[in-house]
Amino acid sequence: MLEIKVVGSGCPNCQKLEALCCEVVDENNLDAKIEKITDFNQYGELGIMMTPGLIVNGKVLSQGKIPTKSTLEHWIIDSN
């Protein structure tokens, strides 16, 4: 099972990244758990300095921007 963490305060960009992750997981029938991390104190512990942040299976893949859907799909499928 993939473990996907979307890190951020819940701002519009964080919500968009979470929605994109859900789309990619659903469209590719992936077994994944998507977790939102909104506790600012955890950001640094997770290696996130800018939000939104994306962590897949413990690896920071993006921070401070929203990847394109195709890039996100590539990252998630490659991490599976």
Protein language model features and the residues they cover:
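Local sequence-structure signature of Cys/Sec-based thiol-disulfide redox active-site neighborhoods
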Residues: 1-20
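Residue-level recognition of oxygen-bearing side chains
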Residues: 16, 42, 71
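Generic recognition of short, well-ordered alpha-helical segments
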Residues: 16-19, 49, 67
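Conserved helix-turn-beta segment immediately C-terminal to the redox Cys motif
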Residues: 20-34
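Amphipathic, hydrophobic secondary-structure cores in small proteins
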Residues: 34-47
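Structural micro-motif
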Residues: 47-55
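Non-catalytic, surface beta->alpha helical segment in thiol-disulfide oxidoreductase systems
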Residues: 59-80
